[in-house]
Amino acid sequence: MAKLHDKYKETVIAELSKKFGYTSVMQVPRIEKITLNMGVGEAVADKKIMENAVRDMTAIAGQKPVVTVARKSVAGFKIREGYPIGCKVTLRGERMWEFFERLLDIAIPRIRDFRGLSAKSFDGRGNYAMGVREQIIFPEIDYDKIDRVRGMDIVITTTAKNDEEGRALLDAFNFPFKK
């Protein structure tokens, strides 16, 4: 079991209950899922690019991503409806906690010129979204085997009612927000 999940059960629940005055442990915000999304618009020209993106995402997440397709045609981008333009994966349960641990302990410290994550990236409902410019910050990616540096979006979905509760939850896990 992931150590952050144990920390959540042992200390975070009590800490947040005390801070916000919850009467039941079911009221305490928790991380519901983590979604990784990689937009690969260049895959329209070359199918190999999408295969490489899926391979990278599988290595990072530990499960195979779903290839997302264009919903409608856009002539300006030379995209037709049904073309593969990205991939996404939703992590829940044990895999989610393991990924969250790797993100905090290994990946975020490896970001170049890192000065903390913006606290303004909450969506108003306690969910946090962040972007990563390069996939090589994850230890599962072999630098020599990548064809190009790709970024991705990481969304942490919580059961928090507002941004204040969501931030308190992530702060309890020592999430590196800008001061």
Curated annotation (Swiss-Prot):
Belongs to the universal ribosomal protein uL5 family. GO terms for biological process: translation. GO terms for molecular function: rRNA binding; structural constituent of ribosome; tRNA binding. Part of the 50S ribosomal subunit; part of the 5S rRNA/L5/L18/L25 subcomplex. Contacts the 5S rRNA and the P site tRNA. Forms a bridge to the 30S subunit in the 70S ribosome. Keywords: Ribonucleoprotein, Ribosomal protein, RNA-binding, rRNA-binding, tRNA-binding. The gene is rplE. It comes from Shewanella amazonensis (strain ATCC BAA-1098 / SB2B). Pfam families: Ribosomal_L5, Ribosomal_L5_C. One of its GO terms (cellular component) is ribonucleoprotein complex. InterPro entries: Ribosomal_uL5, Ribosomal_uL5_bac-type, Ribosomal_uL5_C, Ribosomal_uL5_CS, Ribosomal_uL5_dom_sf, Ribosomal_uL5_N. It comes from the Bacteria. This is one of the proteins that bind and probably mediate the attachment of the 5S RNA into the large ribosomal subunit, where it forms part of the central protuberance. In the 70S ribosome it contacts protein S13 of the 30S subunit (bridge B1b), connecting the 2 subunits; this bridge is implicated in subunit movement. Contacts the P site tRNA; the 5S rRNA and some of its associated proteins might help stabilize positioning of ribosome-bound tRNAs. HAMAP family: Ribosomal_uL5_B. The keyword Ribonucleoprotein applies. This is Large ribosomal subunit protein uL5.
